[in-house]
Amino acid sequence: MTAHIISGTAVAKQVKANIAEQIQAYTAQDKRKPGLAVILVGMDPASQVYVNSKRKSCAEIGIESKSYDLPAETGEAELLAIIEQLNHDDSVDGILVQLPLPKQIDATKVTEAIVPHKDVDGFHPYNVGRLCQKIPTLRSCTPYGVMKLLESTGVNLAGLHAVVVGASNIVGRPMAMELLLAGCTVTVTHSRTKDLAYHVSQADIVVAGVGKPNFVKGEWIKPGAIVIDVGINRVEGKLIGDVEYSAAEAKASFITPVPGGVGPMTVAMLMQNTLQAYQVHLQAV
């Protein structure tokens, strides 16, 4: 068996085309464009790449992007003041603060300072809580993107056993909630999990997000499983995932590549969340 490749690039292109079409329909009625404020603190090279990708997507689909590039020594109070100003700016529908932040800034405080209806990253406790209660509004972009990729396979997820490798706030925890919402039986593994290989070998769906290259071994994969690799690791100048790709591809029914799998979907779902926040904002005016 050789797995079908789930192209995040192709699915993301469809998602963004649909968003662009909806924005054109609004602007044709003399409505303003959606607005996304993107805040970058410091010059972390990986963060710059991610932020530029988000700004480029905004330009492509008709979202007005507002850039706030702040020096690395920016204080917490200064950043919170900018967020407070954007919270009250009617031309801004979404606020994104690129993580990680410099050590002098408390990321939790920053996340909670963004009003929930502009939290297009889906990190605010209010939005995470909505997902936990089965009434999601703005959803965490990477897990939301993973669900779109799973949807693209045409496989009915209800009743399948999903194993999430990694329990981070950004991927693992909201991912488990998304899979639960889709009717999966969910196991979450983490750094203290015993016999990880056994848990992975039981999975109909494996979602790996630990940030360790080739951490999930191909031999652990159950024949016919769906494998979603969230990891992006640079090794000897190449990008590789958290899953041992070639060995897993030989056993899986579907698999995402790295790059070109989950990465493009994270940006696409950020655009989707921005459109959703914009639509809610328009209705409230």
Curated annotation (Swiss-Prot):
Xref: Gene3D superfamilies: Leucine Dehydrogenase, chain A, domain 1, NAD(P)-binding Rossmann-like Domain
Family matches, as InterPro entries: Aminoacid_DH-like_N_sf, NAD(P)-bd_dom_sf, THF_DH/CycHdrlase, THF_DH/CycHdrlase_cat_dom, THF_DH/CycHdrlase_CS, THF_DH/CycHdrlase_NAD-bd_dom
GO biological process: L-histidine biosynthetic process; methionine biosynthetic process; purine nucleotide biosynthetic process; tetrahydrofolate interconversion
GO cellular component, one term: cytosol
Binding site for NADP(+): 166-168, 191, 232
GO molecular function term, any single one: methylenetetrahydrofolate dehydrogenase (NADP+) activity
Catalytic reaction annotation: (6R)-5,10-methylene-5,6,7,8-tetrahydrofolate + NADP(+) = (6R)-5,10-methenyltetrahydrofolate + NADPH; (6R)-5,10-methenyltetrahydrofolate + H2O = (6R)-10-formyltetrahydrofolate + H(+)
E.C. number(s) listed in UniProt: 1.5.1.5, 3.5.4.9
This protein's name: Bifunctional protein FolD
